[in-house]
């Protein structure tokens, strides 16, 4: 369900991108094999802002990259919860995580 006020990562989308950039650890085996891809992760932002029910919605094509995407999602700090009619609500969220070698 979509909430009147969607959940937000602390500091907004810019901080989320910064968090991902600083916390994704590109697996060595993936680097050695030049594996790239985009893993689309789905998760629920709970009423208290915690992250739950994380799963891969669309695979990057590489299990190692998918596992790293999930790890970084599950380790995110609490979000500001979504709101509906003045109450905190659970909101499902999808986020693409890109793995690209420089």
Regions inferred by a protein language model and the residue ranges of each:
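Cyclic nucleotide-binding regulatory module and flanking cytosolic helices
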Residues: 1-14
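Intrinsic disorder and flexible coil segments
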Residues: 1, 45-48, 95
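A short, well-structured alpha-helical segment
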Residues: 11-19, 35, 46, 50-81
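G2-box/ATP-lid motif of Bergerat-fold
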Residues: 38
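Short, positively biased Gly/Pro-containing turn/loop motifs at secondary-structure boundaries
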Residues: 10, 25-33, 70-102
């Amino acid at each position: 369900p979509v909430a009147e006020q969607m959940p937000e990562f602390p500091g907004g989308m810019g901080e989320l991108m910064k968090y991902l950039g600083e916390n994704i650890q590109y697996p060595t085996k993936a680097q050695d094999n030049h594996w790239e891809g985009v893993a689309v992760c789905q998760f629920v932002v709970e009423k208290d802002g915690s992250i739950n029910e994380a799963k891969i919605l669309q695979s990057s094509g590489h299990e190692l990259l998918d596992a790293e995407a999930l790890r970084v999602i599950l380790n995110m700090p609490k979000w500001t919860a979504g709101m509906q009619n003045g109450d905190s609500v659970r909101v499902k969220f999808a986020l693409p995580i890109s793995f690209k070698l420089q």
